[in-house]
Amino acid sequence: NGYVYLQYRMYGETEGQDKVGGKNWNENNNYGRLQLEGTINTTENQTFYYRLRTYDSLNSDHSWDKDDELKMHYTVNHGNLGDSKVNFASRVQYIKDIDHALRYEARFDFAEYMFNNDFIKTTEMVVAPYYEYTWNRDGVKSSGDNYDNEVGLYAYFGNQLPYGFGFNVELDTLGFHNYGDKTHGVYDGVDLKADPEAKKNSDSNTDAAVNIYLTYGANLYSSEKVSVDFWAETGYDSYSWSDKVAKDADHEKYELKTDPQVTLTYHATPTLDLYATAGAEYRNWMRTNERSASNWRWQPFGIVGFRTTF
């Protein structure tokens, strides 16, 4: 059994985009994203997940800077460790966008030891050490040294709060990188103003990225066949840090956003939903350095799609 989601998301023009340079507001405008996503539960404790994203322009200009992406992972739930309440699962993941990344995670879920009361209920408390190998970095196919060996830690803390609220913290990565060579590594004190074509000059780095969200969902209307729901996710998406950066660059960056939206759903059958969403996202799209984060602006979006289970 499993599910299939198919949706087309349309992004409009960012507020004030026609009055200033795109590098000040948002480089990605007037484009669409087709997404196919699904899960197949092959056994009671094994799951295959896939997600395919492709992008296209909604006008005559190539007005976005995003790469098509394929993401797949296979998860095996091994059950609880001994007599404990800690669930252990293994996950193998592959991602293809401009490069290729293959990853293994050992996932430990401590949710049963966390909060479970009338005020807060922990749904996930996952801690997952991982190893990831990335090759063809930056889309350079000719270099055998253009790779990244990374060991790190992933964590996710998901909580349900009263009145439709939720609070989620995700350590998206705490990574220790070892690159194929210094040419394909990272900047380390390079003065890019003096030498814009400088080669990257460190073959190792440590970085981290944290996502923190407060969510809110509410049903606005419901009948046997139709429902209208509100949803918003607000927070850091993400707050990141890198040990090695170019000269005078910030080690810390962040994007802070909120994305209120309303969804109309038609429940066609017990296993098929058709839906349409209208919303907007408010974010500092381009200026993300911690010392100079600014230019928060709205970008509208719309979604049409369906969800089906089998």
Provide a role label for each language-model segment:
Residues 25-115:
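Outer-membrane beta-barrel channel domains
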Residues 2-4, 44-50, 79-88, 114-126, ...:
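Repeated loop/turn-to-beta-strand initiation elements of outer-membrane beta-barrel proteins
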Residues 2-12, 50-54, 88-94, 127-133, ...:
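Transmembrane beta-barrel strands of outer-membrane/channel proteins
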Residues 109-248, 308:
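Detector for outer-membrane/organellar transmembrane beta-barrel domains
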Residues 71-72, 294-310:
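Outer-membrane beta-barrel "beta-signal"
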Residues 1-58, 134, 301, 307:
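Short glycine/proline- and aromatic-enriched beta-strand/turn motifs that initiate or cap beta-hairpins
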Residues 34-36, 72-74, 104-108, 153-155, ...:
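Membrane-embedded beta-strands of outer-membrane beta-barrel proteins
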